[in-house]
Design a protein with these regions (language model features):
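Histidine-acidic metal/acid-base catalytic patches
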Residues: 21, 28-29, 86-108, 112-194
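Active-site acidic/histidine proton-transfer and metal-coordination neighborhood
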Residues: 1-105, 115
Length: 194
């Protein structure tokens, strides 16, 4: 369900409350949510942000009490998710500043961020306090991580580690055709083992 649609909020709160309780009971630290799409409801980005803030404030005390993070995922709208609202970090920062919770932030998907914003390491430094989880994926193509892509993954791993991040990094990619999936994952783990 999309957080930008106010008509969804009651049902989302009910479903998400159960998920928060289950996550806390099973030591699952993060729950991923999505902002929604511009085409849904025909609203402006500002109205969508306001609606997301309203909903996130409704669940704020529950996640703080239960010790679970809500992570709104950043996705690119240029290649993979046309019309997705949270496609630039600054939009998400505005939402998170207004929600004002140490338990509500965003999933910084580095693949998506590189496509729509770039400037990955500076963005991580500037907005790390809102980043509750990270995803990777080779740019371009969302293939496995390697040293012949746009991003220096080892450097990014060091940036994240230097900020004392203790959470998970999800390697969310597809191995290139003909690649060994296990070897690709081992390579990603090696890159991020800093």
């Amino acid at each position: 369900m999309e957080l930008n649609i106010k008509e969804n909020h009651d049902e989302m709160e009910k479903l998400l409350s159960a998920t928060i309780d289950d996550s806390a009971a099973n030591n699952v630290p993060n729950i991923i949510v999505f902002s929604g799409y511009r085409s849904t409801g025909g609203m402006s980005d500002q109205e969508a942000a306001d609606n997301c803030v309203t909903f996130l404030k409704r669940i704020k005390s529950r996640v703080e009490d239960k010790g679970v993070n809500i992570c709104m995922e950043l996705l690119n709208s240029k290649v993979n998710h046309r019309g997705y609202i949270f496609d630039h970090v600054e939009w998400g920062v505005d939402v998170m500043e207004r929600v004002d919770s140490t338990r509500i932030g965003f999933l910084y998907d580095i693949y998506h961020a590189q496509i729509d914003d770039g400037d990955v390491s500076r963005t991580i430094h500037n907005h790390f306090k809102f980043m509750k989880h990270f995803h990777t994926g080779g740019v371009p193509g969302r293939w496995e991580l390697s040293d012949d892509q746009e991003l220096n993954w080892r450097y990014i791993a060091k940036v994240i580690a230097d900020l004392n991040y203790e959470g998970f990094v999800g390697h969310e990619y597809s191995p290139m055709p003909g690649s060994d999936p296990a070897a690709c994952l081992k390579q990603a783990f090696g890159i991020f083992n800093v």
